[in-house]
Amino acid sequence: MKKLWTWVGFSLFCGVAQAGPQIGVGVVYDYLDGDKSTYMKRVFNGGTSTAFVKVNILEIIYNEDGTYQEVPLQNQASAVARDGLMASPARLIVPASGVQGTRLLFMGDRDKERYFRVRFVPVVPEAEDEFAISAQEREDYKKERVEAGIKVLAGYGTVFFVRPKDTRFDTVIDDNANRYQLRNKGNSVVVVDEFKDCAAQKENDCRPTTKHHIMTNRSFSFDKEAGREYRFTLIEGGEKKAIEIKG
């Protein structure tokens, strides 16, 4: 599990630069509720030139030992007998200071929760990339980048959770004198959001705030320390509960 989250978020595909397209995708964890089949994801461009963005999707398959593999899906253009997540459109042209959206559509089996990595990758458009621009526009864009000295293309990776059709939450709490544990006995991920571990008498003496996803049949726990307080928000789908524990 821990390795999965290290790949989430901002990643650099080349060197370092300030000019050119600079995309953002908002939150890096998205959740599709059991009664929904589509989700709109917006891509923002805060840069100085147009961003040509490819949307790539892999399914995350977990093994019994907790390790996982990322499996490529079928061709985005084919929806025949599809089982997985697709982006429409899978190619975005986002103007400077503008925003464009792609619709993430799930088709297939929802008896259990499924997980996908969605990558938003800015590229220098080539003919095979299937962006709706002319050959001359492609060449003009390349020339513009060279003249501006742009050497970086920065993209984002997000994790997309597809909840089961019949979503059921069942979080079991085990709170004893020395240890606190949450165990997920439901069939969909629950979230421990903004987990804070702070000194009881010093409000600003806190360890780094963290976020944890508790998968089905997994648990999250921590040892209580005297003189410390633990605060977080437990999120089960649309339900949120603030929890405070004293060490």
Language model features: what each stretch is:
Residues 20-49, 166-175:
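Beta-sheet-dominated interaction scaffolds and their linkers
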Residues 174-247:
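Intrinsically disordered, low-complexity segments enriched in serine, threonine, and glycine
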Residues 58-60, 107-167, 230-247:
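Terminal connector regions
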